[in-house]
Amino acid sequence: MAKIVDCFADRPIIVGSGLAGLIAALTISPEPSVLVTRSALGAETSSAWAQGGMSVSLSPDDNPSLHLADTLAAGDGLCDAVAAESIILEALDAFHVLQHFGIHFDQDSNGHLALGLEAAHSRRRIVHVGGDRSGTAIVQALTACVLNDPSITVLEGLEARHILMADNVVCGLLLANPTSEIVLPSSRILLATGGIGGLYDATTNPVNNFGQGIAMAARAGAVLADMEFVQFHPTALHCHNRPLALVSEAVRGEGAVLINERGERFMADIPGAELAARNIVAQAISAEITRGGQVFLDARQALGARFSTRFPTITALCHKVGIDPVHMPIPVCPAAHYHMGGIATDRQGRSSIPGLWVAGEAASTGLHGANRLASNSLLEAVVMGTRAARDITSHNTPHPLGTIPITPKKPDTTLIRPIVSQCLGVLRHAADMHRAIAALLPFVEGEEESSDPAIVALLIAIFAHLRTESRGAHARTDFPLKHDTTQRRNMTLEDVLEIAHSRIAQRKEKIS
């Protein structure tokens, strides 16, 4: 039986210690809060692994309108333009917030900010730290600030398993580790639980990040949005490791080119070439690999000996697998990298459930649309983590605890990953998605270790099945064209389960 811990009663609870969670905790301060993380503070987060940096218009030839135009173009018609504009207009504030917490962004030899160029950006607007160590440096600095803030209680080694509800509002959170189970009573929970890359064999995310926050919110009845849109980073370091190391877009921004095993530059005739939007590059690389080829990122001519100083982290990662990027092309492949979909939120990070806020990759704000513009994720994490935190401090209506359920088993993705990897990858087809739905539904309804990962996977499968077009990161070989008009889709888990049962019944009728 879970132990109720009353000493933190009604404090805001933040789940996750990536950029959004850390910023939220620091923003809520000096009001006391509790930050829950399943591992060490700041560890096992996608934020800490970010190489590129954060997008912000700072150069004389740039402005927020150009940044917005690039964001909307990458989003392929599905961005919420109002939400996107509001976030981008706060980019400069986000930049100053990070500076306030001790982050020193790279400068050029003249003492000016060094601005990087990444795919689908029309201007150099990526601020970075330590070359390609932006995420690590930012998370380390914010982690130190959190640990030095007496108003923030950090609970490490505890995994959020269930959002407790009473009368359709949040009343607490059930946490567990291998030796204990506890309940934190609270009417204010902020999920900053990251993405879903752990559902895939090939991912650049921490392998335990399968969308736990999405699964918990879905069980609680939250509205989900745009779940079909999974961004595959085009250039993960192709090797036998899991997760795969990221070879940042910034390498292509510095002039590196993509070649196949024959030395052909297959992106040369595609608009934008190597700096086309991520979905375009990922799909082109996937097509090369599908035909039995290999793909390499060649920086020898563009960077040469400068590679190791501009990209020290990538250099070290390459050396670990026997690649010298100064003298050798880097083998690359697409890998699940970022989820544009998630828990639907409003401008303040509120979900459809009273008492539940969401920030960072777990949320669907409308900024990214069908395809995220590079380095907009760190921007969104800072802006929305700040907004949600400020909104949380203006709400505090305690609710008594409802029924405490039996603690769900520790989630395990082992049986789900093969289904997702084979059926919901870069290129999709109705037949594969039908197989995924049929395979996932028993796991969803089985309430075993695979149940929560299966919920997230089923959400992706049903949303993808219903979008009968190719748009942004959602590419269907049976529907290769875009519709003239389109819209974002919002559904609950109840909606998705009803559709899943209906589709399976229809398939059985056709077979019989």
From Swiss-Prot:
Coiled coil: none annotated. Keywords: Cytoplasm, FAD, Flavoprotein, Nucleotide-binding, Oxidoreductase, Pyridine nucleotide biosynthesis. It catalyses: L-aspartate + O2 = iminosuccinate + H2O2. It is an enzyme of class 1 (oxidoreductase). Pathway: Cofactor biosynthesis; NAD(+) biosynthesis; iminoaspartate from L-aspartate (oxidase route): step 1/1. GO terms for molecular function: L-aspartate oxidase activity; nucleotide binding. The keyword Cytoplasm applies. Its cofactor is FAD. FAD binds at residues 17-20, 46-53, 361, 377-378. Its EC number is 1.4.3.16. The keyword Cytoplasm applies. Binds 1 FAD per subunit. It is found in: Cytoplasm. It holds the Pfam family Succ_DH_flav_C. The active site is at R278. The record marks E118 as: Important in orienting the L-aspartate substrate. One of its GO terms (cellular component) is cytoplasm. GO terms for biological process: 'de novo' NAD biosynthetic process from L-aspartate. Belongs to the FAD-dependent oxidoreductase 2 family. NadB subfamily. Catalyzes the oxidation of L-aspartate to iminoaspartate, the first step in the de novo biosynthesis of NAD(+). This is L-aspartate oxidase.
